Amino acid sequence: MKKTQTWIITCIYLQLLLFNPLVRTKGICRNRVTDDVKDVTKLVANLPKDYKIALNYVPGMDVLSSHCWIRVMVEQLSVSLTDLLDKFSNISEGLSNYSIIDKLVKIVDDLVECMEEHSSENVKKSPKNPEPRHFAPEDFFRIFNRSIDALKDLETVASKTSECVLPSTLSPEKDSRVSVTKPFMLPPVAASSLRNDSSSSNRKAANPLGDSNLQWAAMALPAFFSLVIGFAFGALYWKKKQPNLTRTAENIQINEEDNEISMLQEKEREFQEV
């Protein structure tokens, strides 16, 4: 009986794990981001403020949701950081900067590899090709931090996302984070100010309340049915095994009674012979 109960519980858990869509993998590339990103602030402080870093930038990055630009931006960040690394490799005074950039290059390369391994339906092609631009260090690494945050929240399962369509009124002057240099006040890893600013607004735009409710309903129904199926399988197995267990117990009792009768008969014969 104990084995039967254990099997029923195991069956239910397997049903939940295999068929429950609420069990999702979020942040699939989160483990690729190491603590080395904390050195970004130190690197920005070491670089001259008037230094310009080349980057192929996706137009409208601050208007579009992250799934529209994340793949392209990560690839372009890898190219720009690699070029920056090559420039510091020949400068003996910049060994500290070289070490930091080298670690950042490895992180970005790992993220590119992670995105290739986990092809997400959320990731779409940018509506425009990247444009070559030059950024001050703090603006460049602001884009870096935002891309890191977007990748840390990347999911493998497609969700309701907005279309990657640029507003017709978008212009370089309105792309404020590109044209205006702001104090580098971002936390090295989370970039919380950005998350509270543009990232949050993008996510809200990409997942309206109505769509979110429908999405949760669509996930909850299969989860409920999978739970019912698990209980049904467990009940059927118990019902099938219960008669066998009853018959086995009865057979054991009959065998014991037969053995007792045989022993009594044997003793009776021995007594008669004496």
Curated annotation (Swiss-Prot):
Localisation: Cytoplasm; Cytoplasm, Cytoskeleton; Cell membrane; Cell projection, Lamellipodium
Source organism, top-level taxon: Eukaryota
Cytoplasmic topological segments: 239-274
Pfam family of the protein (one): SCF
Disulphide bonds in the chain: C29-C114, C68-C164
Keyword annotations of the record: Cell adhesion, Cell membrane, Cell projection, Cytoplasm, Cytoskeleton, Disulfide bond, Glycoprotein, Growth factor, Membrane, Secreted, Signal, Transmembrane, Transmembrane helix
Membrane topology listed for this record: Single-pass type I membrane protein
GO MF annotation: an example: growth factor activity
Residues linked to a glycan: N90, N97, N145, N196
Family, similarity comment: Belongs to the SCF family.
Subunit architecture: Homodimer, non-covalently linked. Heterotetramer with KIT, binding two KIT molecules; thereby mediates KIT dimerization and subsequent activation by autophosphorylation.
Protein name as annotated: Kit ligand
Originating species: Neovison vison (American mink)
Gene: KITLG
